Amino acid sequence: DAGADADAAGTDEVSGPCILHCRKRNEGFKTSSKVQYVARTGNFIDGGAEYTGALQILKVILSYDYLWQNIRVKGGAYGCMSNFNRIGEGYLISYRDPNLKKTMEIYEGVVDYLKNFNVSDRDMNKFIIGTISNIDRPMNPSAKGSRSMNLYMNRVTEDMIRTERSQILDADQADIRELAKVLEAMLKEHSLCVIGSEEKIEENKEMFMEVKTLS
């Protein structure tokens, strides 16, 4: 009957991935705030680079060295972060940041920073240990369930996890320098979004394809 047909239709498995077609907008949102939230994004796989477990180490390096020192310590922002995932999506973000153009210049400078990356073996080991500590942090049952669901929905296998872990543990400074190509591929897309003060966005409106006011 019709009800049975409807029930059966509702149980059909999805035959393929859901594809969202996005376009670059490079938006600037003007607010009454005196600080900015500044993001640069891009897909490094689309740019010809590949994902590697060493990118998880890079997140730690940027958080405690390059982005932290330049955006937080010298630039006066409240914080900064980065991320790089298996499908090639990456971002660099600052928040409660008094700067805009200067922060964009710092993002562009990350490629040269990586090309010339040189630290002591002790510091390199600290970055690796910090990365593994993030991966192996204790989880309660709820967190374990959420992680398992996330891995399942993103089709991440045990083999992929083991490979990534080996890439992290075996990484050296040369591997980090190779990541300059990944960041270069990500940044050449030149996708950005800023929420910030009207003054800063108007001063740098040439950066944006669209400028809007948030009320």
Q: What label would you give each PLM region?
A:
Residues 26-28, 67-68, 78-81, 177-183:
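Generic recognition of flexible, low-complexity loop/linker segments
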Residues 5, 161-164, 178:
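C-terminal structured domain segments
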